[in-house]
Each structure stands twice: as structure tokens, then as C-alpha cells.
């Protein structure tokens, strides 16, 4: 306010919006609670170097995720000991490695990844690739990953 008090050239317009001055702990707590409730539903988003995933549904011995692989994102060349996976492409054209074979899938196409198979997803496109992943198995945790290659330095 010290600058405005000394200015000779001021214009003002009426602004009719909710306003809260963060001058007290009470106001800071109020804003914190608003933001906490707004983002509470997003707690199942997990960010990775290649993009992110959201846990959509977790049942007995199965887990449904939505994967979002950013442009030029590459998942590890990996395998799992306790789960198989089924991928359904909903957006983009991912390059899939399954054992020694490579495929390019389009929206609406799917692929089954048997337990113990070496696999990878790559997004060579400019827009994100979206995949619905169904995991089926006795252990459905991120610790069930053996990484053979990883462009982000996470290989075992």
C-alpha cells in the first residue's frame, strides 16, 4: 500500500469475487481445509518418471489402473513373479514389447501379459497414451517388479 499512496496515476475497477486475506492463522487453516478436501479424491494418483497411474478399483486378487504415459515416456523393461496383466489402449498408439516381440497398438486394442513375461510400454507419440491395466495375481504391489532396463536409472 505504500506505493499506491504515493502514485498520481491510479485507475480502479470493481471486482466482485470472494476474497480472503491470509493475515491470520484462522484464515490459513480455512484455506488449507478447502484445498485438502478438493484434492482428497486424487490421493490414488501416483507420479512416475514416465507419467502417472491412478488406482481405479482394488478387489480380491485384482487391481484396475489407468496408466497415462507422457510423450516419449518409457516404462521399464520388466517382469512380475506374482501377477499377470491385461492392457486396453484407450488413447494414443503405444509401442509394446512382450518378450522378444514388438507391437504397436491403437485405441480399442488390447494385449495380455502372462505372469513372468518380460514387457514394456513406450509412447513415441506427442500426446499421452492412456491404458486401462487389469492386474490379476496373489501380490499386487509395486515391489513385484524386476527391472532389466530402465531409462530413468531404476534397473535392478
Residue ranges of predicted features:
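Left-handed beta-helix
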Residues: 1-111, 117-120, 140, 146
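Double-stranded beta-helix
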Residues: 43-47, 120-156
